[in-house]
Amino acid sequence: MSSRMARRRARELALQGVYQWLLSGNSPQVVEAHVEAEAADFDKVDRELFVMLLRGTLDNVGALQDEFSPFIHRPIEELSPIERAILLLGTHELKHNIETPYRVVINEAIELAKAYGGTDGHRFVNGVLDKLAARLRSIEVEAARAKKDAGDGQA
């Protein structure tokens, strides 16, 4: 499995863990152990990313929800558990994993929403995380926009 696929799979498994935690209320340790035991390919996953995402998200749910809640325009309780889990993971990664470009974080969240969420869930996730990235990573977002604008002017 390529390193890119190992990271994507780590995000999928972290999503499963957060989703399981939201529905079951089990401790983060129980959830982590269950996900590891159930994933037949866990030995090929980027374990460091999986642990960082799952533990970091579950240890900071309240603070992460506070970050994205201004952009959802409805009570958090009305989100589907899968959308909530994806937003929690994406918010954590935007905030605490700055080595990963914001566009990669958002794209990976969109792919998770397409694979596991409702019909238009990916659009919702994209909109929320895009606004959040502009706030959490304003320098990176502005640099990307300036580069795009400069490229558009050269045509």
Curated annotation (Swiss-Prot):
Q: Which residues form the signal peptide?
A: none
Give one GO biological process term.
Answer: DNA-templated transcription termination
Q: Which InterPro entries match?
A: NusB-like_sf (IPR035926), NusB_fam (IPR011605), NusB_RsmB_TIM44 (IPR006027)
What GO molecular function terms would the record report? Answer: RNA binding
Query: Which GO terms of the cellular component aspect does the record hold?
Result: cytosol
Keywords tagged on the record:
RNA-binding, Transcription, Transcription antitermination, Transcription regulation
The protein's job, in short, is: Involved in transcription antitermination. Required for transcription of ribosomal RNA (rRNA) genes. Binds specifically to the boxA antiterminator sequence of the ribosomal RNA (rrn) operons.
Family to which this protein belongs:
Belongs to the NusB family.
Protein name as it appears in the record: Transcription antitermination protein NusB
